[in-house]
């Protein structure tokens, strides 16, 4: 995790505060501890960008996207851990920051990674309540992004497992059944028969995602998928 955020912990022996400035991590990042409810969070950021892959996180951090966009970048590293979900929940709840998810356009990214961030894992509702981010919104990559940003030749065919996962979500998952916009997006993906990774934008240049895609999308945050 990196960006305009100060995390205040305490020395377990002396009780003295320990302040971690997450804009001063060099080429690295702040590691979210497994237990983080005791931490004090201070930030001037405008939003949180939760990113699926380490590669994209590192690229955005290297180019200091968090500085130009005044946001906090969080690497989910696939399906986000309970600690990551709890930390992002606190950013959303305690600091009142909007949370946007940036994952691959495939059934796994949508139905596993994003869904887990948004509503939690398959555990009980009581447990999920503290380890999910109900206010999170899906920025992309969406099936419509493939068309809008002309990524058709940077896609891959959906695998049988992808088709099965998307159809199962449409038929059996209450979350996706609750949102017509998600039903439309998943059906669009199935009709197109393709998936796209975050790295697909590199067809337009290595910095396209930073200079074009993200700025365009963030301006339309109110239109993000629920």
Model-derived features: positions:
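Nucleic-acid enzyme cleavage-core boundary/entry regions
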Residues: 1-98, 107-226
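Active-site glycine-centered loops adjacent to acidic/histidine catalytic or metal-binding residues
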Residues: 104
